[in-house]
Amino acid sequence: MLTLASKLKWDEDLKGSQTSVSTSDSTRRFSMRDKLLVTEVAELEANLPWTCKVHFPDPNKLHCFQLTVSPDEGYYQGGNFQFEIEVPDAYNMVPPKVKCLTKIWHPNITETGEICLSLLREHSADGTGWAPTRTLKDVVWGLNSLFTDLLNFYDPLNIEAAEHHLQDKEDFRDKVDEYIRRYAR
């Protein structure tokens, strides 16, 4: 992370010392997304929920990182759930792409990793979708909340999991526990 930030700083320093042709070539190396991410990643790391950890496999690529959510309450307590977050070039006009890498029995996450979280939608009927004013911090806090207060059995993506909960809460909990033992340790 510091590597990209250092490169951006170096790029800014170059602006003052090179001709306008060289400066424009130098400036093109970093997209607006990358410049935003330097600030947003610092803010994210300073404001992470204590049940979350971020990992940047390549510190020079702030647009690709992993998030681990380890809920401390509710159905998913004791599990470690991995998410892959990829920030597209058009960020912050479009939301990041997020996939759950951990197989999970959850009404708002499919077993293949698709996620139902309104702020990850480019357009949302209820007006809570993505907006350029949102940040990575909002995404991480939203993903964390899918295991607690945003857990929604009445507007599910995984209909089978939601119906399972509505029909037999105890059996639902048993299946969640089984998935945690098998996939989320």
From Swiss-Prot:
Pathway: Protein modification; protein neddylation
GO MF, any single term: ATP binding
PTM note: The acetylation of Met-1 increases affinity for DCUN1D3 by about 2 orders of magnitude and is crucial for NEDD8 transfer to cullins.
Residue numbers annotated as active site: 116 (glycyl thioester intermediate)
Gene3D superfamilies: Ubiquitin Conjugating Enzyme (3.10.110.10)
Gene Ontology process terms (BP): protein neddylation
PROSITE patterns associated with the record: UBC_1 (PS00183), UBC_2 (PS50127)
Assigned protein family: Belongs to the ubiquitin-conjugating enzyme family. UBE2F subfamily.
Protein known as: NEDD8-conjugating enzyme UBE2F-B
Originating organism: Mus musculus (Mouse)
Gene: Ube2fb
